[in-house]
Amino acid sequence: MRDIKTYLSVAPVLTTLWFGSLAGLLIEINRLFPDALTFSFFSF
């Protein structure tokens, strides 16, 4: 029972950290490459 409580308290923290870092990474990518729909190396 104690292991289940430990898992239930660790999983939301890890999920929050993961999605927070993923959101930060996506924000920084969109800041560096603002128009990601048309990359310059795709236009021939």
UniProtKB/Swiss-Prot annotation:
GO terms for cellular component: chloroplast thylakoid membrane; photosystem I. Pfam families: PSI_PsaJ. Signal peptide: none annotated. It is a single-pass membrane protein. Its main location: plastid. InterPro entries: PSI_PsaJ (IPR002615), PSI_PsaJ_sf (IPR036062). It is found in: Plastid, Chloroplast thylakoid membrane. It comes from the Eukaryota. Keywords: Chloroplast, Membrane, Photosynthesis, Photosystem I, Plastid, Thylakoid, Transmembrane, Transmembrane helix. The chain crosses the membrane at residues 7-27. GO terms for biological process: photosynthesis. May help in the organization of the PsaE and PsaF subunits. HAMAP family: PSI_PsaJ. Belongs to the PsaJ family. This is Photosystem I reaction center subunit IX.
